[in-house]
Amino acid sequence: MRFHRLARAKLGHPPAAQDDTRGRRNRWSNVCYSAGMRWDQDHESSDVVDERGRSPQGAQLGGAGILGLLPLLLRFRFGWVIVVLVLGFGFLRNFMGGGATQRVADTAVTARGADVPAHFVAFVLDDTQATWTRIFADSGKTYRKAKLVLFSDSTQTACGAGDAATGPFYCPSDERVYIDLSFYQELANRFGAKGDFAEAYVVAHEIGHHVQKQLGITARVDHASRSQQQGAESSSVRLELQADCFAGIWARSTDQRKLLEAGDVDEALGAASAVGDDRLQRQATGKVNPETWTHGSAAERARWFKKGFDNGTIAACDTFAATSL
């Protein structure tokens, strides 16, 4: 698969008048209707860090591995190609040598973030973390909130240098989710996963990885042997499918609160399927090799999201105990 970069214009304020309903503000309130999910701009997370337009410090991959939505992509002379179908975990810690120095943002949210995509991400982050705060509290635990960093093209993390080509990802070392908003254009145009709830699924999946860290699941997988981190039944695949299931738990919560419209769940299922290992491999090479999977097939990713949506419990998302994925 050739994964070309999109032209990246800076996102700013939306035009005053729009012909479609995406991001349209209700004239009487701050509630927005985006041809799907109902969301409120008065309920946005303060844990969003806008680093778009900044030049990251150079660094090599180090620390705990990133956990992302897509297999790792690297650029060669003839375009973007999949060279390794794995993201993160211990054996990548010294892949390129050296450590990483985390760059701490000096502001929580910048004024430049006053655009519809950023507002929507901030709302979804707030809602997902409020949901997990309640779930943890119900079991006597305290949920520790993650930060979400908006960046352009590349960024520096405690896990090393991050790049937009890898798609959205979560860094366990700094407990931050990283998103280049242009990925949503790729998700819609290249992968065919359109709609605002497809975009919301991306955030919910990455927050699912943050939940895994707090439950101690990430550490157990990180210590798994190298041979257990690739393949259709691997710990890597089970970790990713569980994050999909956790995203489904959040989706169930939004449905119970009447935030969803008809077709929203289908959008999320479509997004989960679009980034299945089998589908990406087939696009890249015309062949499917389950032995190199790290995220699960399209059908598995959709199935586990739906399982979380249908059951709404952490116990239902135990992919590690499942005999069949």
Q: For each of these PLM feature ranges, what is it?
A:
Residues 32-109:
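Long amphipathic alpha-helical segments used for membrane anchoring, targeting, substrate engagement
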